[in-house]
Curated annotation (Swiss-Prot):
Family of the protein in this entry: Belongs to the apolipoprotein O/MICOS complex subunit Mic27 family.
Transmembrane segment boundaries: 111-129, 138-155
Species name: Pongo abelii (Sumatran orangutan)
PANTHER family, per the entry: MICOS COMPLEX SUBUNIT MIC26 / MIC27 FAMILY MEMBER
Protein known as: MICOS complex subunit MIC27
Gene, per the UniProt record: APOOL
Localization terms from the record: Mitochondrion inner membrane; Mitochondrion
Keywords in alphabetical order: Membrane, Mitochondrion, Mitochondrion inner membrane, Phosphoprotein, Transit peptide, Transmembrane, Transmembrane helix
Mitochondrial intermembrane compartment spans: 28-110, 156-266
Membrane topology label: Multi-pass membrane protein
Length: 266
């Protein structure tokens, strides 16, 4: 019995050690399996070495919608502008009516007399221009009504006059600048010199030399020592020396680099 107990005691630690070793080995295998990169899995393909982006071409349906949108875009914008203009006009008119109603509901004390003065002045202008031309029929009532309004509302009339004068001045300055720019442009174009035709000018030092010579001496002519030395020095500095006889005179001509020519008499 004692031997059996000792055997059990010796076998239990060995079993525990084996179990712990197997568990540790299993954990290491699991950790190794978890450290695998996603690119190394068989479900992924190797990326190409050289890739190029290709833009997707629009189809027929997309091109059709684009052409319709571009064709109707300007008309839609014009309709939107008209709608906004009409809407703002209606809103301003409604607001003006509301303000006028509130003002007329509780008018100040001097409102009715002032309106009476303006109305009477306008009617007086209409009556005075009854037998006149159309211009008088328009200007007389407006002028007298404006005069009556100026008398009744001097402060507002001064403000309106200042604003109108500023607008007129700005418009006149713009017109003056446009006319001035056109005038300066036209004056600059007129002041520019016209291109002249190229003319061939001959210098006064150029002298025409006849191509034909009467007679060229083939035999040598004895020259004095001074002239021979000059001829030698000139022949050294030039490329051509030609001696000709014209009318009993011996003429020596040098090349183009020599300015003087020698004349000898026999």
């Amino acid at each position: 019995m004692a031997a059996i107990r000792m055997g059990k005691l010796t076998t239990m630690p060995a079993g525990l050690i084996y179990a712990s070793v197997s568990v540790h080995a299993a954990k290491e295998e699991e950790s190794k399996k978890q450290l695998v990169k996603p690119e190394q899995l068989p479900i992924y393909t190797a990326p190409p070495l050289q890739s190029k982006y290709v833009e997707e071409q629009p189809g027929h349906l997309q091109m059709g919608f684009a052409s319709i949108r571009t064709a109707t875009g300007c008309y839609i914008g014009w309709c939107k502008g008209v709608y906004v203009f009409v809407k703002n006009g209606i809103m301003d008119t409604v607001q003006f009516g509301k303000d006028a109603y509130v003002y007329m509901k509780n008018p100040p004390r001097d409102f009715l007399p002032k309106m009476g003065v303006i109305t009477v002045s306008g009617l007086a202008g209409l009556v005075s221009a009854r037998k006149g031309s159309k211009f008088k029929k328009i200007t007389y009532p407006l002028g007298l009504a404006t005069l009556g309004a100026t008398v009744c509302y001097p402060v507002q009339s001064v403000i309106i006059a200042k604003v109108t004068a500023k607008k007129i001045y700005a418009t006149s300055q713009q017109i003056f600048g446009a006319v001035k720019s056109l005038w300066t442009k036209s004056s600059k174009e007129e002041s520019l010199p016209k291109p002249k035709e190229k003319t061939k000018l001959g210098s006064s030092s150029e002298i025409e030399v006849p191509a034909k010579t009467t007679h060229v001496l083939k035999h040598s002519v004895p020259l004095p020592t001074e002239l021979s030395s000059e001829a030698k020095t000139k022949s050294e500095s030039t490329s051509d020396v030609q001696i000709s006889e014209v009318g009993g005179k011996i003429i020596g001509t040098w090349g183009p680099n020599v300015t003087n020519s020698g004349v000898l008499r026999i």
